[in-house]
């Protein structure tokens, strides 16, 4: 008859103690003890947006909000040069018929915007527009001509 294995015959490895305060996910960085506020000090604009289409629409964090799906109805002129005030790699989803408020912040850097729906393809900053760059009015006319919905209500500047 075989003998039962004993603890002495099969020693267990010593348990390692984990310092949970220093723990971080693989590849992650701990930048500060306190939460980090995104877009700190940037002006914010709040708009009411309604999905008039029959399909869900999802908008990513760094999409030029002026150029989002043509079936989203909001004051597009107030969204010129702005993006969602949400963490990178996240999105806001609008189901058909949904109406919700979104908060927008200006793009940083030189504020040149290209691609998306090709409504701007140039500088999106405030102030005088260089002659060779499209301006807010031209982009708004282009959006209207291409059937992008807009309304003049539902926007406010947040402090």
UniProtKB/Swiss-Prot annotation:
<dbReference type="InterPro" id="IPR036461">
    <property type="entry name" value="Urease_betasu_sf"/>
</dbReference>
<dbReference type="Pfam" id="PF00699">
    <property type="entry name" value="Urease_beta"/>
</dbReference>
<dbReference type="GO" id="GO:0043419">
    <property type="term" value="P:urea catabolic process"/>
</dbReference>
<comment type="subunit">
    <text>Heterotrimer of UreA (gamma), UreB (beta) and UreC (alpha) subunits. Three heterotrimers associate to form the active enzyme.</text>
</comment>
<dbReference type="InterPro" id="IPR002019">
    <property type="entry name" value="Urease_beta-like"/>
</dbReference>
<dbReference type="GO" id="GO:0035550">
    <property type="term" value="C:urease complex"/>
</dbReference>
<keyword id="KW-0378">Hydrolase</keyword>
<keyword id="KW-0963">Cytoplasm</keyword>
<comment type="function">
    <text>Disrupting the ure2 operon has no effect on urease activity or pathogen survival in BALB/c mice when administered orally.</text>
</comment>
<comment type="similarity">
    <text>Belongs to the urease beta subunit family.</text>
</comment>
<dbReference type="InterPro" id="IPR050069">
    <property type="entry name" value="Urease_subunit"/>
</dbReference>
<dbReference type="GO" id="GO:0009039">
    <property type="term" value="F:urease activity"/>
</dbReference>
<protein>
    <recommendedName>
        <fullName>Urease subunit beta 2</fullName>
        <ecNumber>3.5.1.5</ecNumber>
    </recommendedName>
</protein>
<feature type="region of interest" description="Disordered">
    <location>
        <begin position="1"/>
        <end position="23"/>
    </location>
</feature>
<comment type="pathway">
    <text>Nitrogen metabolism; urea degradation; CO(2) and NH(3) from urea (urease route): step 1/1.</text>
</comment>
């Amino acid at each position: 008859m075989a003998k039962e294995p004993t603890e002495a015959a099969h020693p267990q490895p010593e348990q390692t103690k984990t310092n949970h305060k220093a723990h971080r996910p693989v590849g992650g960085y701990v930048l500060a003890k306190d939460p980090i506020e995104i877009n700190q000090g940037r002006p914010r604009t709040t708009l009411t947006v309604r999905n008039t289409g029959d399909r869900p629409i999802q908008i990513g964090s760094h999409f030029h909000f002026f150029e989002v799906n043509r079936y989203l109805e909001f004051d597009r002129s107030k969204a010129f040069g702005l993006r969602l005030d949400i963490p990178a790699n996240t999105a806001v989803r609008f189901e058909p018929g949904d109406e919700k408020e979104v908060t927008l912040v200006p793009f940083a850097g030189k504020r040149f915007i290209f691609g998306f729906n090709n409504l701007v393809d140039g500088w999106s900053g405030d102030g005088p527009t260089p002659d060779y760059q499209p301006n807010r009015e031209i982009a708004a006319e282009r959006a209207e001509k291409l059937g992008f919905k807009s309304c003049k209500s539902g926007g406010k500047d947040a402090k």
